[in-house]
């Protein structure tokens, strides 16, 4: 199991890039924390999710007055 945004998922064996595409994330507006480290967007395709990994995906939103 991979823990993504606090939920256990059966996503081991796919890349971060593939996961983001499956879930329709816009990679221009997110940051991925992989096992407590922010990873560069260039690493998304080569970073393969493994059992025990912890991933947090943070989206940026504009706002203000």
State what each model feature region is.
Residues 1-65:
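Ubiquitin-like/PB1-type beta-grasp interaction modules and other compact soluble beta-rich domains
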